Swiss-Prot record:
Xref: Pfam families: Tryp_alpha_amyl
UniProt protein name: Alpha-amylase inhibitor BDAI-1
Keyword Disulfide bond: yes
Signal peptide feature range: 1-30
PROSITE patterns: CEREAL_TRYP_AMYL_INH
GO molecular function, one term: serine-type endopeptidase inhibitor activity
Gene giving rise to this polypeptide: IAD1
Keywords: Alpha-amylase inhibitor, Disulfide bond, Secreted, Signal
Organism the protein comes from: Hordeum vulgare
């Protein structure tokens, strides 16, 4: 009876290991400090209303009033988890595109403002505001990681 019990336990342990290994492998790609930026994990995405105003003014070449810059920088600094700052800025950019009906092409967001220019301006807000972000684009300081992607 002892040998049969040992074989059964060994088989159960082996099955458990086979089940757990793929689950932990899949989770490891998505785990890290950035996982707390997911709204499903309780993160409240900041609307960054003053940053919207700043980027719109900058994109068409208008001077940005000091209070708009200060307020935008404060909004970004108020995102307590540094890992979430670029995610919230990306979310803001996508919502601006959606509100203006901008598609996936290289068109203007609004007269005088090209989509790729707006994207780079938004990605550079942390550098402009001198707020730290741990997930910078390769070879840059203060520029969000998604600035070089074609998705945003």
């Amino acid at each position: 009876m002892g040998a049969m019990w040992m074989k059964s336990m060994l088989l159960v342990l082996l099955l458990c290991m086979l089940m757990v290994t793929p689950m932990t492998g899949a989770r490891s790609d998505n785990s890290g400090p950035w996982m707390w930026c997911d709204p499903e994990m309780g993160h409240k995405v900041s609307p960054l209303t003053r940053c919207r105003a700043l980027v719109k003014l900058e994109c068409v070449g208008n001077r940005v009033p000091e209070d708009v810059l200060r307020d935008c920088c404060q909004e970004v600094a108020n995102i307590s988890n540094e890992w979430c700052r670029c995610g919230d800025l990306g979310s803001m950019l996508r919502s601006v595109y959606a509100a203006l009906g901008v598609g996936g092409g290289p068109e203007e967001v609004f007269p005088g403002c090209q989509k790729d220019v707006m994207k780079l301006l938004v990605a550079g807000v942390p550098a402009l505001c001198n707020v730290p972000i741990p997930n910078e684009a390769a070879g840059t300081r203060g520029v969000c990681y998604w600035s070089a992607s074609t998705d945003t």
